[in-house]
Amino acid sequence: MTIRLYKAYTPGTRNRSVLGFKELVKTNPQKKLTFWQHNKQGRNNRGVITSRFRGGGHKRLYRQIDFRRNKKNISGKITTIEYDPNRTANICLVHYEDGEKRYILHPRGLKVGDTIISSNEAPILIGNALPLTNMPLGTAIHNIEITPGKGGQLVKSAGAVAKLIAKEGQLATLRLPSGEVRLVSQNSLATIGQIGNVDANNKTIGKAGAKRWLGKRPRVRGVVMNPIDHPHGGGEGRAPIGREKPLTPWGRTALGKRTRKIKKYSNPLILRRRKNG
């Protein structure tokens, strides 16, 4: 996908760039596959902020995506490639031979008119879904299940791709985009290819208002707050944090403190941790 640059008519458009939509099909989303989702604004059921700096943003209709790919042995045809405001990746509409329609994540290189299938014996072609046990080593994959039958949970953002590097016993070894190397059941389903919209991270927001359109509010530094609001707050003028090391707003160690649970069930399955920073 191309990147469209703005001319510097205003300070907001100077250096601003957005993604082009040439490969997308101009169409309305399928009504049966969309529904209204209430915007929580970062609050829980009691109205307490649980995720800071969220709120506002443009209204969105949620598109129901088929992450399970459980439509077995029935081929489908790609009819549209559409924009999805709820994720960085684009989506495509699949018309199956039995008349059903579903949205899936758009793999890079898949075009309107192409045919895909989900099957245990599916050919190794872009967009096809099959278990890891039937894939050759070195295959590029995305939308990978952690628990077989639960639906894809790994590698689902724009431009993401994982690699199948080994198979032994009941487990397959994957190299994830983060650099993490982990084990997954060979019965887990995955989709062939890399997710499209690879230039999603290369665009420049350009102005604060564009962040507000996305529902993201200003991220305030703790050092400019009052002492009641943050451990770093207070002091006269530009004061240091006054602590031995940085802390979170709730007084816990920040910046470098590992937050992963020591007894998490998947620890034995991770052979190499992801890169930090």
From Swiss-Prot:
Gene3D superfamilies: 2.30.30.30, Nucleic acid-binding proteins, Ribosomal protein L2, domain 3. Residues 229-246 have a biased composition (Basic and acidic residues). Keywords: Chloroplast, Plastid, Ribonucleoprotein, Ribosomal protein. Residues 226-249 are annotated as: Disordered. GO terms for biological process: mitochondrial translation. SMART domains: Ribosomal_L2, Ribosomal_L2_C. Pfam families: Ribosomal_L2, Ribosomal_L2_C. Belongs to the universal ribosomal protein uL2 family. Part of the 50S ribosomal subunit. This is Large ribosomal subunit protein uL2c. It comes from Physcomitrium patens (Spreading-leaved earth moss). The gene is rpl2.
